[in-house]
Amino acid sequence: KLWFKFLHGGEIPATEANLRDAAAGEHFEWSDMYAQFAQEAKEEGFDKIAYLFEAVGEIEKSHEQRYNKLIEDLEKGIVFSREGDTVWLCTVCGHIHIGKEPPMQCPVCSNPKGYFKIKPENY
């Protein structure tokens, strides 16, 4: 919060605006910045470094895709709501909740629903 007074007039923008800004930043990083770094490294004969810049660019591209998916879910109103029963995981304490939405507050650690995510099944 220390730094927010220097950004956006000290106000915290809405989540969707923050996600759009983040997605735009990631887009710049993979499509322009790291691509340029890779090109310059190749031109200077640093093939391994060029490869690493390209690989990091792909990671940044996946970040942009993730932010855009979150924006889409926000617009659809499904970040914290699904049609059928869903397994929700509290990322603070590990509490499991099954339902269409997570609870407003975790019954174990008392953190708000923003700390819940859909439980991943990839181990």
Q: Where do the language-model regions lie?
A:
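Non-heme di-metal
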Residues: K1-Y123
